[in-house]
Amino acid sequence: VIEAFQSAGDVLRLRDVVIRTGYSKGMCFRLLYTLHQCGFLDKVGENHYRLASEVRRRRLYRIGYAAQGQDSSFDREVGLSLARAAEREHIELIVVDNRYQPKIALRSADYLVREQVDLVIEFQTDELIAPAIASKYLEANIPFIAIDIPHPGATYFGANNYQAGLMAGHYMGRWAKKHWNGEVEEILLIELLRAGSLPKARMRGLAAGISEVIRLPAACRTVSIDGDGQFQTSLERVRKYLRESKSKRILVGAANDPSALGALRAFEEAGRAPECVIVGQNAEPEARAELRVANTRLIASVAYFPEKYGDGLLRLALDILARKAAPPAVFTTHQVITPENVDHFYPNDSLLAAPG
């Protein structure tokens, strides 16, 4: 019955407790009366109850969070938003850092199993080890949520990858139609191959979105390279690509913003920035700063709003722990962020760079 109060501020009626617990009305009435008499519940009004203050201060659940890493602002935003939501819900959050490394991710899973957490939120990039990680939680009978990369047996939370790619492709196609009369010579896709099928769907969506807006010339070719989601790797591989490509009108779609910014740097170093336009994914602070630069060749980035992940993840986690019916996948919302609307969606970015 106490677990029916899913957050510290929940005020429930008798029938709410009946619905959440599945117990009979008579049993719930007796239990509510007893819990109130014993000091576990406060009565609010005539027929409403909430957790007593000393119970509210207790951590209702212990949830493990295996963070992807701390190198990108996206990862940090997800972690911070989750920590804020956990604190508000009086949940103990056990945090480990996978540091983008498969071996560490496996050790992190072992640690969370030993900690006997109630649920795990898993954020790791490598699709190849997802089955091994999943088996650890499944054997321990620990429910888990997988962020952005599917894991067998997990509830998925994160990007609608094909849709995010499609939105980017539509925007890029409209830009090419307006500024280049649709005369595109090459499409460069900077992928994140080790993350598997879903980020690849992002790239498929982007290519499809471009084709839905403009009729690509027969001579236009599509080139794919693996940027591994990293600025430096993308910079080096786009440098190599530019040594081989002589195209003058290139649409560049990147799996994430570090890859997009690495590509932009490579084009700028080669003195070929006017020959490209670039669209990123995630709308991270570094990309938003670039969107504010006059005449930048980064024309857009699709936002995933990681600062809102924590609330959505905790709602989903509490539903799972309360044994409510949970969907197999929960998708985040997306928005194309451009130089024209970046200040509307992120009016407080200047505070990020403020001293102190």
What are these language model-derived features?
Residues 61, 198, 210, 305-356:
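Hinge/cleft segment of the Venus flytrap/periplasmic-binding protein
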Residues 1-56:
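N-terminal helix-turn-helix
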Residues 127-163, 186, 284-293, 346:
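Flexible loop/hinge segments that line or gate small-molecule binding clefts
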Residues 66-80, 95-105, 126, 158-168, ...:
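Hinge/beta->alpha junction and helix N-cap segments in small-molecule ligand-binding domains
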